[in-house]
Amino acid sequence: MKKTIKNTGPQLKDYKSNTYMDGDMEIRFAIGPEETKNLDTQKLAENFLVKELMTPDTLKLVYSHYDRVIIGGVVPVNKTLTLPNHPELRAEFFLERRELGIINVGGTGTVTADGRKFKVEQLSCLYLGKGTKNVSFASASKKNPALFYLLSTPAHAEFPATMFTKEQASPVELGAPETANKRTVYKYIHLDGIRSCQLVMGLTVMASGSVWNSIPPHTHTRRMEVYFYFGLPAEHRIMHFMGNPKETRHIVMANNEAVISAPWSTHYGCGTTNYGFIWGMAGENLVYTDMDPAPVATLL
């Protein structure tokens, strides 16, 4: 029987900006380097910065047209929160044609997927594949709730639900104190780790005294990327650099905020103290090392 997709949304929309709300999910269109270089501080933030991701008893989603990723944050405190379907997806359920990576940066929590419970501790990662129908989130403690960061991409095939702790994520130390970029990289969802259709996901923790991430800078036009910064004290900030390597711009970021990086854009940053960040990619391939260098001395 041929499946009919229910069109539950409006037939015609008058798009007056690059971003709009469709129900409770924000939608953001993709823009190119020529448009981006002319944006002011506010418009840069509107297009690329994702704020207020971690709000108590709230599940927030932002849909980006860069490779159609969905960025999310879930903080269950007083109640269990359920991953909703959304009219924009034109699907029977959220993961009908999608996969989902979940990393917890808070207290211990539980993710229940089609009746199967996963205990997700701090800096553990859970992958849920295409076809997972029911997903819910809960915290073990109200005083120290879980902070679940979500990244979802379209998927064409099913892969099994899999969880990795940070110890299973093949931690690798990179950088040096002399260049203020000593860090530990944890790779969770990638070709040699948790398998997926197109989602690549992991995190980096900066060592004490190190503040520069993703040095040397690079781009990868085969994939877009999202950074989510965490572990940053309230009085500190991240200066996240983006844009064409010859037309760089910056966005000032606080703790628990995400930033969208277009495939053509550099993405690196410097904090006023050390911090951690989750990186996630989607696009043409799953090769973590596939990148085009943009050496520091060539940046403008």
What are these regions (language model features)?
Residues 57-88, 182-225:
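A short glycine-rich, His/Asp/Glu-containing loop-to-beta-strand
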Residues 65-80, 89-115, 215-257:
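Glycine- and acidic-residue-biased ligand/ion/polar-headgroup-sensing regions
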Residues 76-77, 108, 133, 234, ...:
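Short, glycine-/Ser/Thr-/acidic-enriched flexible segments
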Residues 106-145, 151-154:
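Acidic, low-complexity central loop/insert segments
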Residues 142-182, 278-300:
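Double-stranded beta-helix
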Residues 237-238, 249-250, 268-270, 286-289:
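Short active-site-adjacent structural elements
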